Amino acid sequence: GRDLCPSCATRRMVDVSAHMVDQVLPRVQHRQWVLSMPKRVRWHLRHKPEVISGLLTVFLRAVETTIRQRSPGAPPDAHFGAVAFVYRFGSYLNSHVHFHVLVTDGVFSAGPDGEAIFHPALDLERKDFEAVQAKLRHRGLRWLHRHGFERLARYCARRPAAGRRCWCGSTNASRSGARSAA
């Protein structure tokens, strides 16, 4: 396939990045979040697309709730922007489904004339990341249980599978004045 050639994969990555910056992403601060799941969950992610969409939705809602709470002046119906990339392999081409998500570092609300108003989030603190992890763990286990994966949910609820599997990059200033993920 096209992604087995390093030159082709690099060119495609550069093209997608340029398109995202030029055409899709608003000129606001962004942060990259990476989510990896316990190994037992990865098999289900690989073979059952509904698990990918379900757990990614749970993750995005947990992040959005935390960012909204950290955005002063944001109304309760404000939303963030996010672009998720599902990676299916690790760096050694091992099967390893995980998510890289680019998220606005704040939320948007509708102004009086319908224009989008950006409410930047305050700097996230360790407790904010821990809150996302706690929400993800609780809601993710509940999602698995509700969708017929009770045994898997019980396995994931015990240590060490219940450990930290979420990473969030810091924000840095970019050439355009917007902040991007590190």
Where are the model-predicted features located?
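Beta->alpha loop/short-helix hinge microenvironment recognizer with preference
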Residues: 1-182
